[in-house]
Amino acid sequence: MFSKSIIAASLLTAVTAHQNFHQFWVNGVSPGYQVSIRMPPSNSPVLDVASDNITCNVNGNVVPSGVNTTAANEGDAITVQWDSSTHPGPIQHYLFGPVDDASMATGIGSWFKIDEYIEVNGTWASNLMDAGNMSYTFNLPTGMASGEYLLRSEMLALHSAQTVGGAQWYIGCAQLSITGTSGDSCGPSIELPGDYNATDPSIYIPDIYYGFDISTYTPPGGAVATCGASGSGATGAASATAVATSAVSSAVASSSAAGVSSSAVVASSSVASSVLASSSAVLPSSSVAAIVTSAPSTLITATSAPAATSSAVEVGDDECEA
């Protein structure tokens, strides 16, 4: 019989392995901790891909959202930071819009993928992020239409993907007002909910612990979109110019959160100089009382996996339940 202390310790491990998207930076500047993000009521995963929660997490479809919207320009470097987790899997990013008012957008409907980061040399993106302060940087596409958007950050945990419905979805949505240069749309797009299926081979992986080759893995959601007649898709850490963040921390205070956040940001080699020189990285709402913080510039590349992470998945992770 298990002792109460052992059971309690197991439950604590399961909960602390869960995660939320809690901060982002635009060209190295953040509007604040949990600012412009629709925060869910807990850090538990979404399990039902057919539910509305697959869009922006629990309560993420409630409008008006009561969340401020942060300004950005097409092509800007976006850094997201998540809570630490040992769960293996990819990270992807989508946009919903343009809309007139992001705070009134439910997120139910058409999304287009702007970034995906899967693995490097047999190490999952999530494990690489864990070695780099759980931060990851990509660029918004060019050729976008101006307007307000929902930015959906998705971490798919595959440690229980050997059973149908076992994959865990960690999702957070931020509100952005993006200035673009085109009136054209971005595509291809997918429907959420609708285009994710629990039995898709990218979601249900029976052999995840038995010889599965993650270098052959293709995440759900289709191809990364392109925008405008002469625009481009986003540039993420899966490309040759992308980089992952280092484990450099700085305290970030917020009037809406009493906790402390570690921050780190990177830019791709093609935009590094503009990131450092940008004077219009972000325009927080005047109602935002959080401190706007600059992120450190120390970088590590994501072209090789850390030596400490040698396996695709850790068997012990599948004990974590929602």
From Swiss-Prot:
Cu(2+) binds at residues 18, 87, 170. Its main location: secreted. Its EC number is 1.14.99.56. It comes from Botryotinia fuckeliana (strain B05.10) (Noble rot fungus). It is found in: Secreted. Binds 1 copper ion per subunit. GO terms for biological process: cellulose catabolic process. Glycans are attached at residues 53, 68, 121, 133, 197. Residues 1-17 form the signal peptide. Belongs to the polysaccharide monooxygenase AA9 family. It holds the Pfam family AA9. O2 binds at residues 159, 168. It is an enzyme of class 1 (oxidoreductase). InterPro entries: AA9, AA9_LPMO. This is AA9 family lytic polysaccharide monooxygenase B. The keyword Glycoprotein applies. Induction: Expression is not induced in cellulose-inducible conditions (in Avicel- and wheat bran-containing complex medium). It catalyses: [(1->4)-beta-D-glucosyl]n+m + reduced acceptor + O2 = 4-dehydro-beta-D-glucosyl-[(1->4)-beta-D-glucosyl]n-1 + [(1->4)-beta-D-glucosyl]m + acceptor + H2O. Lignocellulose is the most abundant polymeric composite on Earth and is a recalcitrant but promising renewable substrate for industrial biotechnology applications. Together with cellobiose dehydrogenases (CDHs) an enzymatic system capable of oxidative cellulose cleavage is formed, which increases the efficiency of cellulases and put LPMOs at focus of biofuel research. It comes from the Eukaryota. Its cofactor is Cu(2+). Keywords: Carbohydrate metabolism, Cellulose degradation, Copper, Disulfide bond, Glycoprotein, Metal-binding, Monooxygenase, Oxidoreductase, Polysaccharide degradation, Secreted, Signal. Lytic polysaccharide monooxygenase (LPMO) that depolymerizes crystalline and amorphous polysaccharides via the oxidation of scissile alpha- or beta-(1-4)-glycosidic bonds, yielding C1 and C4 oxidation products. Catalysis by LPMOs requires the reduction of the active-site copper from Cu(II) to Cu(I) by a reducing agent and H(2)O(2) or O(2) as a cosubstrate.
